[in-house]
Amino acid sequence: MSELFVKELKVQSIAVSGFTRSGKAMMMKLLSTYDRIDKPSEDIFLEHIYFLHKINKISDQTAKYLLKKNFNILYYFNLIGRNINFKKDDWSSALNYHNPKMYTERLNSTDLNKRLTNKNKIIYQMMLHTGLNSGKLLLSSLPSLKIIEMVKNPIEIAYSWIKKNYGKNIYNKPTIYAPTCKFKKNIVPYYASGWEEEYLKMNEYDRVIKIITNLFLDREKEIKKLSNTEKKRVMLVFFDTLVTQPKIELKRISKFIKRDFTSKTLKLLTVEKIPRSLFSNDYLKKIKFLKKKSTPKIFKKLMIYEKKYLKNLNYNKDD
């Protein structure tokens, strides 16, 4: 019997991963200003491969095949200028790259072999929503991939999700980004797979908080599954450390990806209003809001992850 096979495309690649609303777009814009880093790319279909694998809808073999095949084609399309985004206000637009001419040249170039050799060693950059939660699958499928995982305060993520209505019954829309499942005539996000009954009984606030605390727990478990070699291909970047100590973090990123940041990187920090203070003025108001709207048990779990997050920042709220 024949087996699925994809020849590995050995190209340096970096994925910026993290939960929705965790600072991935900002990180990708910063990376784009580094020496020899491609502009950001995103592909919903590649992401859905590991999303569906996470909830056991596709096998290991099929997921690995599709990830490899999809990555190869995405990289090829990027080289020839196919599907390049020129929408001015979009974070992934070629027009927002420091050298947009490079992408217009790709559109007109016919020398594909020259591009495939990648003599300038330009690192391909892409976004992965919740990618590290499938880190073992991704790193084993794509041996040249490194992952920068954006980690943000769970209070900020929960509040942001609620303001975006992610806990409401919005998942029947045909253009919804996240994978969706049908359960007893109800459409729920894939995050609720395995606890659909509980999800449907919850209010919108408890739904969001439980999803987020589940994601934090799942990411912790996934990191523990990685071998020591795989862990060296992963870098955690805490959002608040990045915005309060940017130059320290930029140097740490440089060491990880083996690329220097540039004067354009420093200019972008100014545009993004970095450095910033550790907490926004309304941080305590957000905590009070979440406490008021959620049930005590659910809120308590959220605060456990907030405490873990602050511990990583060496910050003690009680000081």
Question: What are these regions, as identified by a protein language model?
Answer:
Residues 1-15, 20, 185-236, 242-319:
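PAPS-dependent sulfotransferases, especially Golgi type II membrane carbohydrate sulfotransferases
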Residues 2-53:
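Gly/lys/ser-thr-rich phosphate-binding loops in alpha/beta enzymes
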Residues 14, 38, 146-148, 235-237:
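Hydrophobic/aromatic beta-strand patches that form the interior of the parallel beta-sheet core
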Residues 17-18, 125-130, 150-152, 239-240:
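Short His-Asn-centered micro-motif
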Residues 23-36, 137-142, 162, 236-261:
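PAPS/PAP-binding and catalytic site of the sulfotransferase fold
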Residues 42-126, 180-197:
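PAPS-dependent sulfation machinery
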Residues 45, 152-156, 242-243:
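Conserved nucleotide-binding/hydrolysis micro-motifs of P-loop NTPases
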Residues 127-128, 138-164:
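Conserved phosphate-donor/acceptor-positioning beta-strand/loop module used by diverse small-molecule
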